[in-house]
């Protein structure tokens, strides 16, 4: 009798506590870049769909942009195939990454209109009207099993191609305004999807995401970032959880959100990264069938082979260069005839594995259609450019340069540069080549903006992809590529 009474008392005490919390889930991806398919048993939309089918709790699926380009399927369809895949997954919303503008203004609207989910970009307005076009929204309210989610979106402020159609507003000011509008609707959970990162060390611009969010003292509960291809989990700053999910659909973040069952308001959130191993997730058949139907023909053509793996990352601790980026720079300099070729490391997306090299492998490695531009610069400009690109992270690889430096407290010291074996002369003029994107001042190539467009000339008609194809076909098998061009003392 006493035991029965004790259990009854405990039940009365515990049962109300159990009612205090309600759990919903956010799944997050970013920077998928058209990687629809599993590779070596990992990743792809069918694997993600398989995982979602296993979820027992109510969830919302969100994305932080850069879905439009990065593989041949995405590129050839100008992003529309990516949107079709996301439609099939049931994405609730995404935002605009910088690569959503790879196909310039004419490519943006058809791609976004194909989406069955809202594209949230509060900082993008029509340049003529000052208002958002109908295919963009600032935020969206979602009901997730009775929990009122407000999702705000901010697009990337620096598109890969300058836009004449849109005026891009300052994100921090826009966020202040939209957050006030959202709060007036009394949501339970506020989420920001932003194509920006709290740990971007590769694009040569300081991230403002952390500062503009934390000043709101936790009013934004969860921030879902991207752009830097980083994995960030459970980073809490001033009451806000920051999450980033990597790239290429290799992983997904699962954020568990607890809300008070009585008030409905946000209580807490925690995140975990889930690798999309197909043995664990399975591949959901309808999504796999759609992906296969969208596959571009002819991409399995073998171009040649590699006798060793060519890594895009440095292979020795005191070196800032890598075998694959050096190879890209070398074949492009040979084509251009320049003294120096500058290759932006961010343009190399994946390694070239040992074995056969197909057209798909090459496009996945370097998915851009850029050609080569050539310009004459002073040694002084070249020295400043190299120094800027070394810290906090090495942004570029070079053919024709040897670089040595010390890094002290994040600053470059004792920099030494040799151009084709000769010490750099600040007063000498050098012929420098790079891809057209960097030459035009895109992203980390911004120092080239100070050089007049009339002084830049295109070299030949081949794209860098075509140049690499020819190099593989004529020199296969690719062997080991020397490193040690950038030495950290």
Language-model regions, residue ranges each:
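Feature captures C-terminal
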Residues: 23-25, 35-47, 116-123, 139, ...
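Acidic/histidine-rich, surface-exposed loop or edge segments in extracytoplasmic proteins
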Residues: 26-35, 63-65, 305-315, 364, ...
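Hard-cation-handling environments
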Residues: 282-357, 363
